[in-house]
Amino acid sequence: MDLASLRAQQIELASSVCREDRLDKDPPAFIGGADVGFEQGGEVTRAAMVLLKYPSLELVEYKVARIATTMPYIPGFLSFREYPALLAAWEQLSQKPDLLFVDGHGISHPRRLGVASHFGLLVDVPTIGVAKKRLCGKFEPLSTEPGALSPLMDKGEQLAWVWRSKARCNPLFIATGHRVSTDSALAWVQRCMKGYRLPEPTRWADAVASGRPAFIRWQEIQR
């Protein structure tokens, strides 16, 4: 594995990320959610894509793609491991979203190219990274109150907002992926909350990927 080459690719791609609001439809008609996981001891990469109507946030379509994992787990290079399955799921959607939430980092990455940014560039769609853990940078400790907010800073640059979406839950790291500003990323996530820790697009993507009860109930209703 030529990590030097991958690192150079990340730096080059990161320079093309658009950190300004460039939505083709504002407000969007459809918002997507994406989640990636691994099965069979990491041999299989699974990506779930969901499509929600906006502003109702009603689930209208989902796709799950499973492909052979193309590279090992290497911290800092996860997007190269995850994007092939994301692309496979994306290509199955009959309707593409106007805005995509990705479970993972956007520019809040040591080389400013998390999976939300990498995939957004790949398919040229506005994306937001919604991550559950810090990858780089520092932030002031948050109060325990829901809504507590702090900028994630690295080398004098704000990379994300750290936001406690729900009481007694760890905060989310919300960042520009591509074609969405940092402040707008936070605002869009806040508009897509329904009382859970995660915004509806990535909550549904996780539910579909993992076969959670909410998704099973939804399937039963559709029959």
Swiss-Prot record:
InterPro entries recorded: Endonuclease-V
Enzyme Commission identifier(s): 3.1.21.7
Keyword Nucleotidyltransferase set for record: no
Top EC category: hydrolase
GO biological process, alphabetically ordered: DNA repair
Gene3D superfamilies per the UniProt record, alphabetical: archaeoglobus fulgidus dsm 4304 superfamily
Catalytic reaction equation(s): Endonucleolytic cleavage at apurinic or apyrimidinic sites to products with a 5'-phosphate
Recorded superkingdom: Bacteria
Known function: DNA repair enzyme involved in the repair of deaminated bases. Selectively cleaves double-stranded DNA at the second phosphodiester bond 3' to a deoxyinosine leaving behind the intact lesion on the nicked DNA.
Name of this chain's protein: Endonuclease V
Species of origin: Salmonella schwarzengrund (strain CVM19633)
Top-level taxonomy: Bacteria, Pseudomonadati, Pseudomonadota, Gammaproteobacteria, Enterobacterales
Gene from which the chain derives: nfi
